Regions:
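Terminal low-complexity tails and localization/encapsulation signals of metabolic enzymes
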Residues: 1-6, 266-279
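CoA-thioester-processing core
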Residues: 90-100, 106-107, 113-167, 194-195, ...
Length: 279
């Protein structure tokens, strides 16, 4: 199944939903209609029983350049309009992602700048082409990160490295130390891997095959524990150990009654590949 607007393509195949940002002439910079479609597509994928994994990528040579700087020049009528524009606009994407228990993978095919980098780090995993480059970007145009970088980056790379990324906004060719959120330096893919911003870096020509091979591995797995694992990992960041272990014991009791658990045990005993059904 494929549905699309001019600015975002949505396709479902083999239990994998692909969201493709589609403004290649503008490096896939956001627009209002694109964000509307993005929020819709995430909700659609979450509630579609034929979707087990979501992949987000960009068309052309960029992943996403973030907000359209040319449009920023027009400004907002009031500060309140600007705040509400974020909350009711682009913030729908991280708020929707927070509620999704299906795995979401960013397939980073090129430059990811500003909110484009932010949108990549709020996905569960990131697989990047070896030519991909990253920058928080905001400080270069006198802004604070607007889509959640200050929330997600510290959880990925730690406070000091997050500040370095967000302070500098320059390209980084080699490891640096303390200023990331203040400088908006660009980071090459190998450094992004070293910092923990991405989990895998592959040659440009292999990016699509590598991403979908990983996505299919997850999509073919037992979906009940896969989604419970995602919930447990994210909830663990907000809970004390005893509360977390209480949740773990409850989830374990549930999955041990599932057909997929029984199939997994049977397949192990019979030395064959399991055939999970998601129940």
């Amino acid at each position: 199944m494929t549905t699309q607007t001019d600015e975002l393509l949505y396709d479902v195949k083999d239990k994998i939903a692909t969201l493709t940002l589609n403004r290649p002439d503008k490096m896939n910079a956001f627009t209002g209609p694109m964000i509307d479609r993005w929020a819709w597509a995430l909700n659609e994928a979450q509630h579609d029983p034929d979707v087990n994994v979501v992949v987000v990528t960009g068309s052309g040579k960029a992943f996403c350049a973030g907000g359209d700087v040319a449009r920023m020049a027009t400004g907002e009528p009031t500060a309140l309009d600007g705040k509400n524009g974020l909350w009711e606009g682009i913030h729908r994407v991280p708020k929707t992602l927070e509620q999704m228990d299906k795995p979401v993978i960013a397939m980073i095919n090129g430059v990811a700048v500003g909110a484009g980098m932010g949108m990549s780090v709020m996905c569960d995993m990131r697989i990047a082409a070896d030519t991909a480059r990253f920058s928080t970007g905001y400080v270069r145009v006198g802004l604070v990160p607007g889509d959640g970088d200050t929330y997600f980056l510290p959880r990925l790379v730690g406070t000091a490295k997050a500040l370095e990324l967000l302070w500098t906004a320059d390209f980084i060719e080699a490891p640096k130390a303390l200023e990331l959120l203040w400088t908006a330096d660009f980071i090459e893919a190998p450094d992004a891997l070293r910092l923990g911003i991405v989990q895998r870096v592959v040659p440009d020509a292999e990016l699509r095959d590598a991403t979908y091979a990983f996505a299919r591995q997850i999509a073919d797995g037992p979906q009940i524990p896969i989604r419970m694992i995602k919930r447990l990992v994210y909830q663990s960041m907000k809970l004390d150990l005893r509360t977390h272990l209480d949740l773990v014991s409850s989830h374990m009791a549930i999955v041990r009654q599932s057909d997929d658990h029984k199939e997994g045990v049977a397949a192990f005993k019979e030395k064959r590949a399991p055939k999970f059904q998601g129940r």
